[in-house]
Amino acid sequence: MGIESRIFNKELLSKITTAEEAAKHIKDGMVVGTSGFTPCGYPKAVPLAVAERVKKGEKLRLSLLTGASVGVELDEAWAEVNAIAKRFPYQTGKKINQRINAGDTMFFDIHLSQMAQQLRYGFLGKMDVAIVEAVCILENGGIIPSTSVGNSPTFLQQAEKVIIEVNTSQPMELVGMSDIFIPADPPARHPLPITDVNQRIGTIYMPCDPRKVVAVVPCDIGDKTRPLAPIDEQSKAMARHLIKFLEKNYGAVLPPLQSGVGNVANAVMAGLVESDYKNLRVWTEVIQDAMFDLIDAGKLNAVSGTSLSPSPEGLQRFYRDIMKYRDKIVLRPQEISNNAEIARRLGLIAMNTALEVDIYGNVNSTHTFGTTMVNGIGGSGDFSRNAGLVVFLTPAAAKKGAISRVVPHVTHTDHTEHEVHLIVTDQGVADLRGLDPKEKAPLIIENCAAPEYRPLLWDYFNRAKKKVGGHHPMLLDEAFSWHVRFNETGTMKPEGAA
């Protein structure tokens, strides 16, 4: 079936063209914004056509703005031909990651909730073209988003030209799942009238001026979501420790939950399926497989996010029972899903993943050994600075014990000790609220560090207190010595340690 039946604005029927023709609107040096937040709802046909132009010898270096990470047809295809001069605001693909760390692509790592407003303010440059995936186009030109919303509403508003990919692999049952609202910019912004997870304040479509539309492109390529690893024993242990803490401190009724992207976050949500909790509500960015488990178990009343982000199997599961799941789900622009005002008002329990933590509660979420970018801060900072309970989870050790995730000092700080409330590892929980740094360290060492690293951390902490003292004892000549040792020997353990 063609896309004509999905285009209700008859003037736009004349704009139907091929991906190759549409791609000609993309020129060297342009700022391009696309739909997509994780590998869901991103354009596929036009980006592939752009990459083909470069493969044939044309020079294209572009600034690429999205909601977050996107699929292989965009990030990876463009990175492979080195077409991305600058990337905003998050990424997960192997090739784009290599380009960033090699210096071929400049990467602006920004809190996800702030990007749309900064674009409207003009800080990120003038957007030349927006490429947006649609389920269908309404009579007024409004676009029904598919499996993510991200920054698309603002991109459509700000771009000089718009290319719409109507994706027939996305079911029409997605119509009505989104709630699109663009807030006024400060200082004219009013309070956002959301006091519960399932409240709606906008429209089901993204406004778009039909006069901006230069091409409407058919596409039938499905979302290529990423597999989730099987839930391992470390992740199960973290989930058990956290749920036990919640049961003790919150009782039977929890405030809305926020859960980050990835295997650990999915494992924690999966752990709630086996708990006694009912009537759960989730206000988050991404909706992964465990959310469907909670809905099926009758434990999740409502979930708000900006994107679906399930495994390939989870996505097919969603499509099979789409009417059941969509009744519980609302997708919003990321400046709403990650909004500081709403996170503070709802008193969220925010659960996100750390690369490493230090004995004082600082968290590194982005850079291995302080240097190599992994994915980006994403939305974790939006929630860590505003949630009612801020939780960071990480295994106590990695690489068969060669790396401790609890270190004397993190090599890069994304979330400071001032906002981190709870650290959870497979070893236990450290509740840091109301504590001096010198009170936090013993809790983190004893409750969260791997057993083989506890004596080493105690040795560092005790010597730091004795040698330099102060409010935040730190041995400057040893703070990163564990990382140096790993680079030199392949383990953070000193020679002769078990």
Q: Which role fits each region the language model picked out?
A:
Residues 1-498:
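Conserved alpha/beta enzyme-core scaffold
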